């Protein structure tokens, strides 16, 4: 696509509902350590947390941001569930969290620390966007769903898959207050790593683009 000089391609050329990147969701072996890297090396700040203290005993997530760039770093608290005998802790895992825990361990085994979800911010009807994506070949991963946080409104999201193990969540925050936690189930963080007071600020504006790597000779098939 050729864009004339000084012409803004957003949002009209990519669809009226598309706003930009909402966040990049990583699966990592050590979320706290990964968050520390982005905070101390790239000027990110911690903005939200999910873990045992917030009602997520099996998974931990740290959310870090630098201006318009937001990363979610998620990792397991315990080993993978299995078909054999399990201790009492693993036997208590609800089916949904069991599936997510197994997925994260498998992703880490195959890829190491890496991106799982490139999430897009959507304005408007997510149901229509999701249906259009699926009708044009996207895999239906999670149908549109609405989550609420008392006092902060609601957030609508859905997820599709394109190729490989990476997925794309569609997120509508139009009725979700700006001072709300990152997502339902998360807790706001406003503390800073003391080392950042000794480091120069790094000003990142936003995520410009993400590249989906393909195996040798695999690009043509994906494009088709």
Regions from the language model: what does each represent?
Residues 14-16, 54, 108-110, 150, ...:
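Generic marker of residues within folded, mature protein domains
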Residues 19-29, 62, 84-132, 159-160, ...:
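Vicinal oxygen chelate
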Residues 25-71, 135, 144-151, 158-162, ...:
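Core segments of cupin and vicinal oxygen chelate
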Residues 37, 63, 74-76, 119-121, ...:
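A structural feature that tracks compact, well-ordered secondary-structure segments
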